[in-house]
Structures are given as structure tokens and as C-alpha cells.
């Protein structure tokens, strides 16, 4: 919206009212049409897949749009034109306020009022609210659901484009706008309450005021102030400020699964061949292949730790990097500050991360659905801010350097075998836990918490322990990662790292136990191969979209279906 507005206002005549405001509205309309096109071509095809797949597909769209914007407008920030007739300032209570700021202040309640009227006083709005509550019933009444949801997506995209376009006199346009606003938009919606437009407006006012005055009152907390507010709100009011308790109910992170069963014989043979190939890799491949293999193995363990709570537990975490980075920092600080060897420092990684997950999980498991996911994100951002600002311990943005394995394990081949052994052990332990009574109880709580509790299962406690074990597993991956890279930085606890794990799980398949390994391999190899090309974001985004559309059950889920089908005798039902 911002980029299009800069170009269209220039085209229409930036110095005239018609040129400026016409360019802003035209940019918003173009963005709305592009959003509707994305819904028709991409999202409509995966509505029956797990809901998080839609999030993954939109992430791919973001990568595509980033590279297209880079090609079209270049890497430099664009300065937007000033609004004609609004270049002065107004004095209010002795303070000078830009006139255009008053326009922005007035625009928000006007949009709020328009949306309220649209959703509460029109037939279309009633149908949208009805379809949100029960889509199948609305379809049974003869309403064209596809057209209805395309219109909703157009409206949302139009408003997003309008927001980007209307702010160009103040902020211009740059390539980092998308990721910079996504987290804030999520926070506002969750604090306000899912399904509450008024709640989102109220939350945006609160966050805006805190961001403005927080610099003066709590300068150390400016990095995570909105996440602190979100954490406090969700702990005391899990459905948001103006949301309803029924909106906090989970909508599911996975489709209905068949009962767990041992892997088919063909799959076990394929797994044995893969393990044999991994054991022979140092003798057959060069140093670069070993470095890449170590990264794939470490990220597979990281993704498996997230899958353990997402698949069997039904808990989608948006902040799992807190435990990956926490384990990495624990091992690095034990090595550099305490002088411990890898034999003592590496076990501290899962221990520290497990304790951190135990503390955060106590609050998180009381929530469900997107509220659970956003609270995990809030805690992860708090941990990330500590890593950035506690420079005396963590080194801040400079990180902790010089964390290398000792001579006896320093050879790359030897370290590869250590990583392979620990990752294989972690994956095997995770699989056995899922097939244990603990794992079945966890699945029971995911599928029906009320029934599980009626059977005497303490669902919250099972989920809490699973969350802690998952954090410990992620911490082990972080410890192995820091010794493979020789350093750790706050980026390992950031939002992009958490979303890397989420993408790997979804690409591999939430419903397949082998999904994290397949997803980690696919994502890492794709990123490594495409990052050497000029348009790597575009190609990676298209690859992610293609994989999501081709394998809505995930790569491993698709492979398991094929192997299971081929293993059936001819004529079997």
C-alpha cells in the first residue's frame, strides 16, 4: 500500500488534493484486489488443511512481495509526499501538533464506525458473522461461501493497504514495513479480543500511548512493552479486553488424525537406508555438505521439539525460539564465563531451557488456540529483550563468541557424529514418549479436554510437562547449534527463528511423526540453494506456496500415505 501510494500520488499529481487522495485510495483498492486474488488462487485451495497452513502460505506471499517490491522500487527507502493543504501545525494546549496527525487521529474512529455499521447493520455483515460461527450451516442455507470470504479478504487487504498508504507523509515506504507491522497487528487483535473490532481499536490506543510514553517512563522496556502488556492481559483475561470466552476456544491446529500406529515396513526400510546414508556421509561428502548436514540435524531436533506439543498436544507455539536460544546461551555462557568444557556445558543447555519452559509454560497452558500461541510469543520477546539489553552477561548485539568444541571433538566429522547421535537419540525418545501412556494422555487432552478430565487425566499438568520437555529438547538443539557455529546472538531467540521452526513443522506435516525431519531438510536445503540467487526470497516464497498447495498434509504425511497405500495388498479396501 505504501509503495503503491508513493508511485500513484506521483502519477496523479502529488500537489493536488485529487492527486494525493486519489492515489491513496487507488493504492488501497489495488492492494484489496491483490489480496482477493491471493485468496482465490492460494488460500481457497487449502481451507481444508490445518489452519496454520494458511499462515505459512501467507508467509510465502510476503517473501514474494518483498522481492517484487525490491525489483520495482529498489532497496532505498522512499519518502512520501506531504498531503496538500495539511503541511502546517496546530497549537493544542501549548503543544504544536502537525495538521496531518489530526487527520490520522480522525481516520481511525471513522473506519471503526464504518466497520461496525457494515458488520451489524447490513445483510452482508450478518452473513459474515454467521459464516464465522458456522460456515457449513451458512453454506447449507444457499449462501456462496467462497464469494463471501473473498469479499472479506478484499476488505481486510483494502484496509491494510489504506493504512500503509495513508501514513506515507510520515513514514514513507521501506522493504521492512511488512515484518515490522505483523507482530504489532497480532498483538492488537489478541489484546482486544478475537472477533471484537472495538477491542482491537481500544488495544491499538493503549499500545500507541504506551509506546509514546514508555520511552520516557521505562526506556529499558521499549523493545517489548506491547508484549508485556499482552502477557499481563492474557494472564488475567485470557480472551482479551472485549473478547468473549467462547472466542478463546481452540479452532484446531491439525485435521482429525487416525490412531497412532507403528510405521509401515516400507517406511522403516526407507528410514534405515537414510540412517545408513547419514553414517556414511563424512566418507562421501566434503566439508560444506557436513556443515549443511549438521545444520539440518540440529534444526530437525528443534522442529521436533515444537512438533511434540503441536501435533500430539495441539498447542501451537509462536515463541519456541526462546528455548532454542536459551539453550544456546546457557551452553555458551557456561563455556566462556565459567570455563566449562563441552561435557559439562552442553548438558546445561536442555536443563536451562527446560526450566525456562517450565516457568513460562505454567502460564501458557491455561490458554487455548491463538491466545496460547501469542502468550508464548510474548514470553519469547521478553527473553529476547533480555538477551539484547543485558550486555554485561549476554554481550547484547555482539553476542557470545569463541564457543568451539574441544580438540578431541573439534574435527568436523567427529562433531557431526556427536550431533547425529544426540539428535537421533532425541528423536527416538520423543517418538517413544508419544507412544507411551503420557503421549496418549496428551492426545486425549488435545482431542477432548472435557472427556479426558472426566477419565481422571489432569490435562493442564500433562500439557505443562510436555511443554517443559519440549523446551528442553529445543535447548539441546540450541546447545548443539552454538558449538557448530562458534557463537550465539540474540537473533536465535527472535520471532523469525520461531517462525522458522513453525514452517519446518508445517512443511513436514503436523500429523506425521517424521514431519519435523522432512520439513527441516526441505526448508534448510531450499534456503541454502536459493539464497545464492538474486531473487531468493521470491523463489523461496513460491516454493513454500507450492509445497503447501501440493502437500496440504505435509511432505512426510504425503510420503507416509503413499507408502501405506503401496504396502496394501491388491484389492484391499
What is each PLM-predicted segment?
Residues 15-61, 68, 202-207, 234-238, ...:
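Alpha-helical transmembrane segments within multi-pass membrane transporters and channels
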Residues 96-173, 197-202, 261-262, 412-489, ...:
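Helix-loop-helix "hairpin" substructures at the membrane interface of multi-pass membrane proteins
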Residues 41, 72, 76, 133-140, ...:
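Cytosolic-side transmembrane-helix boundaries in multi-pass membrane proteins
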Residues 2-6, 28-31, 60-63, 108, ...:
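Residue-level recognition of pore/gate-forming positions within transmembrane alpha-helices
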Residues 46, 54-121, 148, 173, ...:
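Transmembrane helix-bundle core of multi-pass membrane transporters
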Residues 14-23, 49-54, 85, 91-102, ...:
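Membrane-interfacial amphipathic/re-entrant helices at transmembrane-helix boundaries
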Residues 1-11, 37-53, 129, 186-198, ...:
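Single transmembrane alpha-helix segments in multi-pass membrane proteins
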Residues 13-29, 150-236, 321, 346-347, ...:
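Transmembrane alpha-helical segments in multi-pass inner-membrane proteins
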Amino acid at each position: 500500500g505504501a509503495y503503491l501510494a508513493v508511485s500513484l500520488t506521483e502519477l496523479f499529481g502529488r500537489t493536488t488534493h485529487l492527486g494525493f487522495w486519489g492515489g491513496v485510495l487507488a493504492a488501497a483498492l489495488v492492494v484489496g484486489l491483490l489480496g482477493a486474488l491471493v485468496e482465490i488462487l492460494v488460500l481457497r485451495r487449502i481451507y481444508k488443511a490445518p489452519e496454520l497452513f494458511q499462515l505459512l502460505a501467507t508467509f510465502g506471499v510476503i517473501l514474494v512481495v518483498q522481492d517484487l517490491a525490491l525489483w520495482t522500487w529498489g532497496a532505498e527507502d522512499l519518502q512520501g509526499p506531504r498531503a496538500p493543504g495539511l503541511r502546517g501545525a496546530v497549537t493544542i494546549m501549548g503543544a504544536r501538533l502537525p495538521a496531518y496527525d489530526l487527520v490520522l487521529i480522525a481516520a481511525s474512529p471513522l473506519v471503526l464506525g464504518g466497520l461496525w455499521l457494515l458488520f451489524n447493520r447490513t445483510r452482508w455483515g450478518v452473513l459474515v458473522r454467521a459464516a464465522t460461527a458456522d460456515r457449513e450451516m451458512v453454506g447449507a442455507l444457499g449462501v456462496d461461501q467462497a464469494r463471501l470470504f473473498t469479499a472479506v479478504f478484499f476488505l481486510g487487504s483494502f484496509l491494510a493497504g489504506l493504512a500503509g498508504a495513508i501514513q506515507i507523509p510520515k513514514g514513507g515506504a521501506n522493504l521492512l514495513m511488512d515484518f515490522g507491522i505483523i507482530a504489532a497487528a497480532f498483538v492488537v487483535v489478541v489484546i482486544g479480543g478475537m472477533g471484537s473490532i472495538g477491542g482491537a481499536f481500544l488495544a491499538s490506543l493503549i499500545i500507541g500511548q504506551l509506546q509514546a510514553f514508555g520511552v520516557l517512563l521505562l526506556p529499558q522496556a521499549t523493545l517489548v512493552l506491547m508484549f508485556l502488556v499482552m502477557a499481563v492481559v492474557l494472564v488475567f483475561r485470557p480472551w482479551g479486553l472485549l473478547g468473549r470466552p467462547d472466542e478463546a476456544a481452540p479452532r484446531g491446529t491439525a485435521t482429525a488424525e487416525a490412531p497412532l500406529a507403528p510405521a509401515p515396513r516400507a517406511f522403516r526400510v526407507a528410514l534405515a537406508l537414510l540412517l545408513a546414508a547419514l553414517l556414511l556421509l563424512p566418507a562421501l561428502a566434503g566439508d560444506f555438505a557436513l556443515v549443511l548436514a549438521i545444520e539440518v540435524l540440529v534444526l530437525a531436533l528443534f522442529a521436533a521439539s515444537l512438533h511434540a506439543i503441536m501435533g500430539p498436544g495441539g498447542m501451537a507455539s509462536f515463541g519456541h525460539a526462546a528455548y532454542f536460544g536459551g539453550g544456546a546461551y546457557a551452553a555458551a555462557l557456561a563455556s566462556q564465563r565459567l570455563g566449562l568444557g563441552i561435557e559439562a556445558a552442553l548438558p546445561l543447555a536442555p536443563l536451562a531451557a527446560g526450566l525456562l519452559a517450565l516457568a513460562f509454560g505454567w502460564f501458557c497452558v491455561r490458554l487455548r488456540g491463538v491466545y496460547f500461541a501469542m502468550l508464548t510469543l510474548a514470553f519469547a520477546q521478553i527473553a529476547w529483550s533480555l538477551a539484547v539489553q543485558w550486555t554485561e552477561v549476554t554481550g547484547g548485539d555482539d553476542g557470545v563468541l569463541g564457543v568451539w568444541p574441544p580438540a578431541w571433538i573439534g574435527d568436523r566429522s567427529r562433531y557431526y557424529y556427536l550431533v547425529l547421535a544426540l539428535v537421533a537419540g532425541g528423536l527416538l525418545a520423543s517418538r517413544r514418549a508419544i507412544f507411551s501412556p503420557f503421549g496418549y494422555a496428551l492426545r486425549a487432552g488435545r482431542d477432548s479436554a472435557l472427556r479426558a478430565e472426566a477419565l481422571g487425566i489432569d490435562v493442564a499438568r500433562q500439557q505443562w510437562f510436555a511443554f517443559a520437555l519440549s523446551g528442553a529438547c529445543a535447548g539441546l538443539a540450541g546447545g548443539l547449534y552454538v558449538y557448530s557455529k562458534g557463537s550465539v546472538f540474540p537473533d536465535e531467540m527472535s520471532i523469525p527463528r520461531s517462525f522458522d521452526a513453525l514452517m519446518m513443522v508445517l512443511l513436514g506435516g503436523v500429523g506425521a511423526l517424521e514431519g519435523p525431519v522432512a520439513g527441516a531438510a526441505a526448508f534448510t536445503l531450499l534456503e541454502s540453494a536459493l539464497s545464492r540467487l538474486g531473487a531468493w526470497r521470491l523463489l523461496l516464497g513460491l516454493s513454500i506456496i507450492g509445497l503447501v498447495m501440493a502437500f496440504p498434509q505435509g511432505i512426510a504425511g504425503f510420503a507416509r500415505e503413499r507408502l501405506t497405500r503401496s504396502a496394501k495388498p491388491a484389492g484391499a479396501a
